Amino acid sequence: MENRRIIRDMHCVSNKLSRQLDNLFSTQGITHMQFAILSFITRSTNDGKDVFQKNLEISFDIRPSSVSSILSLMEEKKLIKRVSVKNDARLRKIILTKEGSKKYDDVHAKVVMFENKIKSLFSDDEIKVFFNVLDKLYDYTEE
């Protein structure tokens, strides 16, 4: 094998994929993180769970002030609403608006198409090997 560097190559591919995804999101008028939050709220709501700011802070490992800023922008874009909870006035449940739900559906369809294009480059066996390698790298980085 030639003088290839795993970390450098992973970093380059990651940057290129991130740029392509960022372009996809920007053409839809949202950021990658806003889409991730729309996705989280959609999945949680479908599972019958309420979503609060603290859930987002923990799930995405980001600071409360950052989450608050992102949510404020999403409220301005009418993608979400924060509503008070009856039994605790301090808590504000985060819900998708109709616009937010439509935006999620539209962007999610484009993300699925993007992922399917990538998957089409590989055989089923190559995809299995790829995920095995990713799992090992993920486990290694958790040590």
Go through each PLM region and give its residues.
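C-terminal regulatory/oligomerization modules of transcriptional regulators
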Residues: 1, 48, 125-143
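N-terminal leader segment of winged-helix/HTH proteins
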Residues: 1-28
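N-terminal helix-turn-helix DNA-binding core of bacterial DNA-binding proteins
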Residues: 21-63
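Alpha-helical DNA-recognition elements
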Residues: 23, 73, 136
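Short, hydrophobic-biased segments on the C-terminal half of alpha helices
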Residues: 53, 71-72
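Charged, amphipathic alpha-helical coiled-coil/dimerization segments
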Residues: 72-132
